[in-house]
Design a protein with these regions (language model features):
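C-terminal motif of bacterial Sec signal peptides marking the signal peptidase cleavage site
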Residues: 15-18
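Beta-propeller domain segments
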Residues: 21-62, 98-102, 108-109, 115-116, ...
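Hydrophobic core register within WD40 beta-propeller blades
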Residues: 81, 154, 203, 256-259, ...
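Residue-level detector of Asp-centered blade-edge/turn motifs that repeat once per structural unit
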Residues: 84-87, 156-158, 205-209, 262-265, ...
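Conserved beta-propeller blade signature
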Residues: 88-90, 160-163, 211-215, 267-271, ...
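Asp-box/WD-like beta-propeller blade repeats and closely related beta-sheet repeat scaffolds
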Residues: 137-160, 165-206
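Blade-level signature of beta-propeller repeat domains, shared across WD40, Kelch, NHL, RCC1
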Residues: 407-431
Length: 431
């Protein structure tokens, strides 16, 4: 049997190398040079998602020397978070997307995915959390702005609070300490929202506040709706904060779900969810620096210049121009959160990025469902990822939570949004 042969090979490799075969095999799918298997295509992809179960009195698992607490509960699908200059935390809550199904397999996939999501209605709001005395207990949980349209990305600069709805980038005037918006938002720029196969709009802002960067996902897996449906999609927009004028900053990014600016260098980075239906171990979701004018492959190629022969017509010139991402995260982990760390997280976790992995729906053995730390050295990813927040899945295969946004709080914490349990977690170094 193929499985027996594979297990024998792994066992022999473990004996020869002195490390566990399972760990060695997993490590091959991470980093700058992942092992890519041959594509596997079938009538239906593998589909499996864990049944939700409450946290009860349990908590996520964090590394030794850290502790975790829930600082907000009973939310309505928390996605991304933002720490304001005064320490207040904003939480974007909502669920978007309304793409019609093209094939029966799309209907089946939606049913499978729905089993792993909350039954709570979309909040379509931004909630504010406040810990006034700095004791780690957030005694105030109040709605800052409501009647939004599936808000996702959040950014702040010099009294301007930006929210990326699924259809528009908007701005609120903000004064230090206010607990609710004083007026309706001003639209900065309209964002693509027709069909909205991938609806999330990731957001970050340049250090000088001049430009906003918005991640806009594709309208399909691999152009099943035609290239016209992909106009202005599968890319990062650069938007002038004052005028709202935009331009494509980088293209060929199937679904850039979180963006962050690297401290010091000002370099834009992203996590990207790659295409489906090429097998359980293709294609790796990834972390990458985003180069202005760069093309990252979608839909014609993946992980550099590996051709996706499902796409018609082919474009060899585009394939040749495809940039290889910096760091593979593993296939189908569904990375949705990204933030750079700092010294407040301790020496071991001071240099690198935290990534929230929402978890797979299209593998027999689920992956993701955790927050990882990717260490950096000299400004680049270096080494294997480290599990930082786990325990979202139970030993019997059920799911307590699904991490989305991750934000480093300068006061010394990692903030994690959990959109299944409708909780915001706070991870701190033990005192």
């Amino acid at each position: 049997m193929k499985h027996s042969s594979a297990l024998t090979t792994l066992a022999m490799a473990a004996l020869l190398s002195g490390c566990g075969g399972e760990e060695q095999n997993a490590a091959q799918h991470y980093g700058p040079d992942p092992k890519l298997p041959e594509p596997e295509r079938g009538l239906l992809p593998s589909m499996k998602i864990a049944e939700p179960t409450p946290w009860g009195d349990q908590l996520p698992t964090v590394p030794e020397g850290f502790s975790v607490t829930a600082i907000a509960t009973d939310l309505k699908i928390p996605r991304q978070t933002l720490v304001l200059p005064n320490g207040d935390i904003l939480v974007a809550e909502g669920r978007g997307g309304n793409a019609p199904k093209l094939k029966p397999k799309d209907v089946i996939a939606d049913v499978i995915k729905a089993r792993g999501t909350t039954s709570v209605e979309s909040g379509d709001r931004v909630t504010l959390l406040r810990d006034a005395d700095g004791d780690g207990e957030y005694e105030l949980q109040t709605v800052f702005a409501e009647d939004l349209n599936a808000p996702y990305g959040l950014a702040f600069h010099d009294g301007n609070l930006y929210v990326a709805n699924q259809d528009a980038l908007v701005r609120f005037d903000y004064q230090d300490g206010q607990t609710e918006a004083s007026s309706p938002p001003t639209q900065v720029a309209e964002l693509p929202s027709e069909i909205n196969h991938h609806w999330t709009k990731a957001l970050t802002i340049s250090p000088d506040g001049q430009y906003l960067y918005v991640g806009i996902g594709s309208n399909s897996n691999i152009t099943e709706r035609g290239m016209e449906a992909e106009i202005d999609r599968a890319m990062v927009w650069q938007i002038n904060a004052e005028t709202g004028a935009y331009k494509p900053y980088a293209t060929g990014l199937r679904n850039p779900t979180a963006l962050a600016i690297q401290p010091g260098s000002g370099q834009l980075w992203a996590v990207v969810n790659e295409r489906d239906e090429l097998g359980e171990d293709l294609v790796p979701d990834y972390l990458t620096s985003v180069k202005e004018g760069g093309f990252y492959g979608w839909p014609y190629a993946y992980w550099g210049q590996n051709v996706d022969d499902r796409v018609r017509p082919q474009d060899p010139d585009k394939v040749a121009a495809s940039i290889t991402p910096d760091y593979a995260l593993g296939s189908h982990v569904a990375a949705l959160g990204l933030d750079f760390s700092s010294d407040v997280m301790g020496e071991r976790f001071a240099e690198g990025v935290f990534i929230g992995e929402h978890g797979s729906w299209n593998r027999k053995e689920p992956v993701g469902y955790k927050v990882i730390f990717v260490p950096f050295q000299n400004g680049r990813p270096a080494g294997q990822p480290i599990d930082f927040v786990t325990g979202f899945r139970t030993d019997d295969g059920k799911t307590r939570g699904r991490p989305v946004g991750v934000t480093v709080d300068p006061r010394g914490a990692l903030i994690v949004a959990d959109d299944l349990a409708n909780v915001v977690w706070r991870v701190t170094r033990a005192q």
